[in-house]
């Protein structure tokens, strides 16, 4: 089977599918640049940032990939009430992902920040609360 036939079959089947993605969503943020020198304050590289980007991570990435296939996608997840959530919502809207199943909590929206110098990831910062969901949020 050639690639065009495969694309046609996937597009036809996906367009008729409705899928609910349930899981941990996250915002992946990347800061890229060039290492220019070592800091005089501590033996760590100083990176001159030349670019930034944000992408959907975790279950949000799964929903995005399904939407790219033409599937009608809805997502159910927990997020915080913060700027990172706002970024996720903007990305859901622009990709046609239904986020009516989103539940706001007092936890931060899970965000992973990666610092990349040249072609090497040098650092990852995780903003998340890994404790189990409980109380009223679990009921929702």
Language model segments and positions:
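Short, flexible, mixed-charge acidic loops at enzyme active sites
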Residues: 32-41, 116-119
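Short glycine/proline- and charge-enriched loop/turn segments
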Residues: 37-47, 123-124, 129
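Structural beta-strand/beta-sheet cores of well-ordered domains, especially the beta-sheet scaffolds
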Residues: 23, 71, 111, 121-123
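Substrate-binding N-lobe of the ribokinase-like
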Residues: 3-9, 40, 44-111
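Conserved phosphate-binding/catalytic loop of the ribokinase/pfkB sugar-kinase fold
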Residues: 104-107, 115-140
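Short, glycine/serine-rich, charged loops/turns that create anion-binding
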Residues: 26, 42, 80, 120, ...
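Short hydrophobic segments within beta-strands
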Residues: 22, 76-78, 116
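Positively charged, low-complexity intrinsically disordered leader regions
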Residues: 1-36
């Amino acid at each position: 089977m050639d690639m065009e036939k495969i694309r046609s079959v996937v597009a036809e089947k996906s367009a008729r599918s409705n899928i609910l993605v349930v899981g941990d969503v996250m915002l992946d943020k990347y800061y890229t640049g060039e290492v220019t020198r070592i800091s005089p304050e501590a033996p760590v590289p100083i990176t001159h940032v030349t670019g930034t980007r944000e992408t959907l991570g975790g279950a949000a990435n799964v929903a995005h990939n399904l939407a790219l296939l033409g599937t009608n996608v809805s997502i159910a997840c927990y997020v915080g009430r913060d700027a990172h959530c706002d970024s996720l919502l903007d990305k859901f809207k622009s990709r046609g992902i239904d986020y009516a199943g989103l539940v706001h909590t007092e936890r931060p929206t899970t965000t992973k920040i990666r610092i990349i110098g040249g072609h090497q990831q040098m650092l990852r910062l995780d903003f998340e609360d890994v404790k189990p969901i409980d109380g009223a949020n679990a009921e929702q």
